[in-house]
Amino acid sequence: MYKRQTPDSVKTLVSEGHEVLVENNGGFEAGFDNDQYKNAGAKIIEKAADIFNDAEIIVKVKEPQKVEVEMIKENQIVYTYLHLAAAKELTEGLVKSKSINIAYETITDDNGRLPLLAPMSAVAGRMSVQAGAHCLEKNQKGRGILLGGAPGGEPANVLILGGGVVGENAAIIATGMRAKVHIVDKSEERLKQLVKMFGDKIITEQSDKVDLNKL
């Protein structure tokens, strides 16, 4: 279903002559119901096994589960996030299936960027600060520190390792909550870009010139 598994992308594919099969309630958790997909021209299929059996191309978000790997056919094309580096069993299963697998996280654009990984990284970066702030609360057995401080109290120190998409988005939330933010990255050029973005709201350090224990 293109880069986004939405009714709009289904409509585009159908208009180009493709047949699109959607698993029953497959879009429910993302806020899309069966009728939206049907109105876009998709066929709603009750069982995932039937989709794996009939489709030439499988489009997913999460890596194939063990039961799904067993359903993948030879030469079937599978688009999804795979993260195979830490998944030996999944890797071996896909190799055995002789299918063609394209991992979203490895697709690059003309500038060498990872456009399909960036949205997930942005979410991860923003959520990390929220989760950290939550864990600092006393009722979570934290130190009882507010990320942005309070009258008479210092704000929390937030150390961000890496200034990529994850780090940048973590900094957006951390600076927005008025924490003290340090960003460490190996690239001097990237750190300069971040300073342009955040100004004096952050302190930057090159990773080969800093003692993390002192931050």
Feature-to-residue mapping (PLM):
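Short, hinge-like loop/turn segments at secondary-structure boundaries
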Residues: 38-41, 119-122, 199-203
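Short gly/ser/thr-rich secondary-structure transition/capping motifs
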Residues: 39-45, 60-62, 138-144, 203-209
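Short beta->alpha connector loops at strand-helix junctions that form conserved
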Residues: 23-24, 47-48, 81-83, 103-108, ...
